[in-house]
Amino acid sequence: MTERILEQSGLQPSLPRLYDEDDLVMISALQHYLFCPRRCALVHIEQQWQENRFTAEGRILHERVHTAGKESRRTLRVEYDVPIRSLRLGIAGRADIVEFHLQEGGSWLPLPVEYKRGRPKKDDSDRVQLCAQAMCLEEMLGCTVPEGALYYGEKKRRTIVVFDSALRQTVMETAESVHGLLAADGTPPPRYDSRCESCSFLPLCLPKVATKKKVARYLRAMVEA
């Protein structure tokens, strides 16, 4: 089914055909990588974690969602904290919510819902994470998942995300990049930008210090030349 979906969408993945279970990476690693490859390496290579107010609020929100149990109606079934994985993409994780909507022919159409504490981000990291969940569900259930939803705590409403060809391609490319980063087993050097100020890893990463050292080395080299 996954092959048919890719063929219809015109995507040409360069990913290995199948990953071993032991080689799967967390879906959250894709989001970390898109935000900052160094952050991804700190979490998934060096096994570091730093929590601030934002990550704590996000963790509490997810814990509330995951303990909600199950919900069932005549045309809707809701599963919480659903384990998912894709051997093609080499990823695994847990979906906050998967809604199954009854279709006219009697089949159930899954719709993944991811909860976020803040507001929509300027980058695609949340959309990529959600689409990765959908591609896992497609591979596991042998169906097509055309869209999902992001629920942001500050807005208190859902944002529908359509899983088009471009977004799916980004998921595949990001998954491949994450596997490459982890296989290299090295942490990229820090690069400071405005996003660093809200990152929980700021005290550990120290991007400003590293940037100042680079400038100092450059000026020293210019003087000595």
Spans of model-derived segments:
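Solvent-exposed, flexible loop/coil residues
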Residues: 34-39, 46, 88, 132, ...
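Generic marker of residues within folded, mature protein domains
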Residues: 87, 138-140, 189
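Non-catalytic C-terminal interaction segments of nucleic acid-processing enzymes
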Residues: 6-7, 168-225
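Metal-dependent nuclease catalytic cores that hydrolyze phosphodiester bonds in DNA/RNA
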Residues: 1-110, 212-215, 219-225
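Structural motif
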Residues: 20-30, 124-125, 187-194
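Short, charged low-complexity intrinsically disordered segments located at boundaries
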Residues: 60-64, 70-74, 160-168, 200-213
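Nucleic-acid nuclease catalytic cores
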Residues: 92-93, 100-185, 197-203
